[in-house]
Design a protein with these regions (language model features):
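Terminal amphipathic helices with adjacent charged low-complexity linkers/tails
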Residues: 1-9, 115, 119-158
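Conformationally flexible catalytic loops at phosphate/diphosphate-handling active centers
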Residues: 1-24
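Short boundary motifs at domain starts and secondary-structure transition points
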Residues: 16-22, 81-83, 186-188
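Active-site donor-nucleotide binding/catalytic segment of nucleotide-sugar enzymes
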Residues: 24-38, 171-175, 200
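Structural motif
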Residues: 26-28, 89-92, 195, 245-247
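Glycine-rich, anion-gripping cofactor-binding loops and their flanking helix/strand elements
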Residues: 31-114, 214-243
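Phosphate- and divalent-cation-binding pockets in alpha/beta enzyme and binding domains
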Residues: 40, 100-102, 143, 185, ...
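Active-site diphosphate/adenylate-binding microenvironment
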Residues: 161-243
C-alpha cells in the first residue's frame, strides 16, 4: 500500500474545550423538528444572526419564531432556479429529524456543517459534518455572542427573504384542489396560539412551503414514516391542554 485514502473526520467539542473560530461569510442555522424555544434561546439566535450575517432555515416543526426565520422548503425545491440560500459558508444544524425533504436538500450545499446537540449524538444526514458540539444550544450561541462586538449584518437573511417572497409571488392562484392548495389557503388563517399536528411527508412537506401566524406551533412524528400515529398524537395533546386549539 502506497497511499492511505483521506478519512472524513468529525471534531467533538464540549463546553470545556476551546471553541473553533467561526467562519466568515454566510451562515445558516438549520432547525429540524424542535421543542418550543425558550425566550433566552430565541434571543441568543437572533443576536447571533445579527452579528454573523445569519439566517434560520425552518419547516413547520422547527418552532423557532424569532426575527430571522425563513421557510426554506420553497427555496430548496427549485429545479430551474438556484436560490441564494444554497450559498452557505457554514450551516449549523440544531434540532432533530427534518421531515421536509425540500429543506434538507439545502444542507449538502454548505461548505461545512456543524451540529449542536445536548445529547452528544452525531447525526450527519448530509455526510459533511465537520464539528459536533456536545452542549446546550443556548450555551453555543451565547459563546459566540460574547466573543463578538460586530455591527449588524443581515445581508444574507435579506437576500433569502427576497428570494422567498419572489418565489411565493409566482405561485398560481389557481392551484388544483390538493394538499398544497389546502396549505396555501389555510396557513394564514390558522388561529393564533393554536397547535398544528402534521402527517409526515405529504402534509408536512406541503405546509412547509407556507408560513403560519407567529404564535402557532407545529409538530409531526417525523421518526415514524409509514403509520406515523399523527391522529393519536393530536388527540393526546388536545386532551392534555383543553384550553388550546389543536388541528
Amino acid at each position: 500500500m502506497q497511499e492511505i485514502k483521506d478519512v472524513h473526520a468529525i471534531q467533538y467539542i464540549t463546553i470545556r474545550d476551546t471553541f473553533p473560530i467561526l467562519p466568515k461569510g454566510r451562515i445558516a442555522i438549520f432547525v429540524g423538528s424542535h421543542t418550543t424555544f425558550t425566550q433566552e434561546l430565541t434571543v441568543a439566535i437572533d443576536i447571533f444572526c445579527e452579528n454573523n450575517n445569519g439566517v434560520v432555515y425552518c419547516d413547520q416543526t422547527s418552532n423557532y419564531r424569532g426575527k430571522y426565520r425563513i421557510m426554506s422548503s420553497l427555496l430548496g425545491c427549485q429545479d430551474k432556479y438556484k436560490s441564494v440560500a444554497c450559498h452557505m459558508d457554514l450551516l449549523i444544524y440544531i434540532g432533530d429529524i427534518c421531515g421536509a425533504y425540500e429543506s434538507v436538500l439545502l444542507m449538502p450545499k454548505a461548505k461545512t456543517v456543524w451540529r449542536v446537540s445536548e445529547d452528544g449524538i452525531i447525526r450527519d444526514p448530509s455526510h459533511s459534518l465537520s464539528k459536533m458540539f456536545y452542549m446546550q444550544e443556548v450555551d453555543f450561541f451565547n459563546h459566540y455572542i460574547e466573543a463578538q462586538t460586530n455591527e449588524k449584518n443581515l445581508s444574507f437573511y435579506n437576500e433569502c427573504k427576497q428570494d422567498y417572497d419572489h418565489l411565493y409571488s409566482l405561485i398560481s392562484k389557481k392551484i388544483p384542489f390538493s394538499n398544497i392548495w389546502l396549505a396555501y389557503e389555510l396557513s394564514p388563517r390558522i388561529p393564533e396560539g393554536s397547535v398544528m399536528h402534521y402527517a409526515i411527508l405529504n402534509s408536512l412537506r406541503a405546509w412547509s412551503f407556507f408560513e403560519t401566524p407567529n404564535t402557532v406551533r407545529g409538530y409531526s412524528n417525523v421518526g415514524g414514516f409509514g403509520i406515523d400515529g399523527n391522529i393519536s398524537a393530536l388527540i393526546g395533546a388536545s386532551l392534555y391542554n383543553k384550553d388550546r386549539l389543536y388541528f
